[in-house]
């Protein structure tokens, strides 16, 4: 796990200019050619997975503050509790998604829960409209977690999304035996061209299945 490697071998990485590809290359010799390539952006995707026996929350807190720009150091996205949360909606739109939580007793069964509750488990059937609608749902929930606001997010909201604050809130929630179910890596769809994403929402609002917006 990257967090444990940083903790053990490069504990003060946030005080230096860490080349994440070079660091990974030193471990993953099998994929040396991949790390030798040039990239315009680097995305790191973690699962929160509070039930995992190898927890490094302090290091991850530092990582999420350090890896905050995809075209420079790299950008870290954390899914709560794991990747499958991107499709943990019972319908599209799903206005109840804002309030969905996962409780401690269900952490180990999350994949099964998603499989039983998702509106569609077959990602091969997802189209552009589906992915945009999902990204908007998750962004709306992240805004709710961060600011306790229940409204449609704007591009300015996206620009001021504080992943470190969201992680801290989720970490505190964990002490109360729950976390909010939300996916952040799906926001890569927005991160690539934020203005284009929000322009599409504005111009073609009724084409998407969006929460918390009155559609004509």
What role is predicted for each listed range?
Residues 2-15, 21-216:
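C-terminal accessory helical subdomains adjacent to catalytic cores in phosphodiester-
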């Amino acid at each position: 796990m990257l967090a444990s490697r940083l903790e053990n071998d490069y504990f003060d990485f946030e005080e230096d200019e860490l080349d994440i590809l070079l660091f990974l290359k030193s471990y993953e010799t099998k994929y040396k050619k991949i790390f030798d390539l040039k990239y315009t952006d680097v995305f790191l995707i973690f699962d929160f997975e509070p039930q995992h026996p190898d927890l490094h929350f302090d290091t991850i807190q530092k990582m999420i503050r350090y890896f905050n720009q995809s075209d420079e150091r790299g950008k870290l996205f954390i899914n709560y509790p794991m990747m499958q949360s991107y499709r943990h909606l019972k319908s599209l739109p799903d206005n109840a998604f804002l309030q969905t939580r996962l409780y401690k007793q269900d952490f180990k069964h999350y994949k099964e829960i998603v499989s039983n509750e998702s509106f569609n488990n077959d990602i091969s059937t997802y189209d552009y409209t589906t992915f945009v609608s999902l990204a908007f749902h998750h962004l709306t929930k992240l805004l709710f977690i961060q600011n306790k606001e229940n409204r449609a997010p704007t591009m300015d909201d996206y620009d001021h999304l504080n992943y470190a604050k969201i992680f801290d809130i989720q970490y505190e929630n964990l002490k109360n035996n729950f976390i909010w179910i939300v996916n952040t890596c799906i926001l890569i769809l927005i991160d690539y061209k934020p203005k284009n994403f929000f322009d599409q929402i504005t111009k073609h609002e009724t084409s998407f299945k969006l929460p918390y917006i009155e559609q004509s």
